């Protein structure tokens, strides 16, 4: 019996919606990253994007444990000397809550073209509304 290898033409992708309300950031991010890679499917192939589309709603209500809300810091750099910027979890959650989940999931995906293709299948929204109703997403409990 030959080993099955998925090809981009044979991959079927589903749409799932995840409610992040009251969920812990790391717990939800690991499950999302697994689904984006397609590791939950029996036809998973490491060099082929076999993952599903994931819609995350209520990103503004995601939680972290302990004192990380005050202590967790996100860094970015402009590329110029002295251009490093930092922002705390609390401020980023108030300013751009989608970015918190995006950064957590992106760090768990492969680096390179395949990882970027997987990341493009993640759609994050701060509130409870999303504009992907036409795709008929299934609710995914995490």
UniProtKB/Swiss-Prot annotation:
GO CC, one annotated term: cytosolic large ribosomal subunit
Keywords of this entry: Ribonucleoprotein, Ribosomal protein
Residue stretches spanning the membrane: none
Signal peptide boundaries: none
Single Gene Ontology MF annotation: structural constituent of ribosome
Function: This protein is one of the early assembly proteins of the 50S ribosomal subunit, although it is not seen to bind rRNA by itself. It is important during the early stages of 50S assembly.
Subunit structure: Part of the 50S ribosomal subunit.
Alphabetized HAMAP family for the sequence: Ribosomal_uL13
Family, similarity comment: Belongs to the universal ribosomal protein uL13 family.
Record-given protein name: Large ribosomal subunit protein uL13
Native source organism of the sequence: Shewanella sp. (strain W3-18-1)
């Amino acid at each position: 019996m030959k080993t099955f290898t998925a090809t981009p033409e044979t991959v079927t992708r589903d749409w799932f919606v995840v409610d992040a309300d009251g969920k812990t950031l790391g717990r939800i991010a690991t499950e999302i990253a697994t689904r984006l890679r397609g590791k939950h499917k029996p036809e998973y192939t490491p060099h082929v994007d076999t993952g599903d589309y994931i819609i995350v709603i209520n990103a503004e209500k995601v939680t972290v444990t302990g004192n990380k809300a005050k202590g967790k810091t996100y860094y970015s750099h402009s590329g110029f000397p002295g251009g490093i910027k930092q922002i705390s979890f609390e401020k980023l959650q108030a300013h751009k809550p989608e970015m918190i989940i995006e950064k957590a999931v992106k760090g768990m995906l492969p680096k390179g073209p395949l990882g970027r293709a997987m990341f493009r299948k993640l759609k994050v929204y701060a509130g409870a509304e999303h504009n992907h109703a036409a795709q008929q997403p299934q609710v995914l409990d995490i």
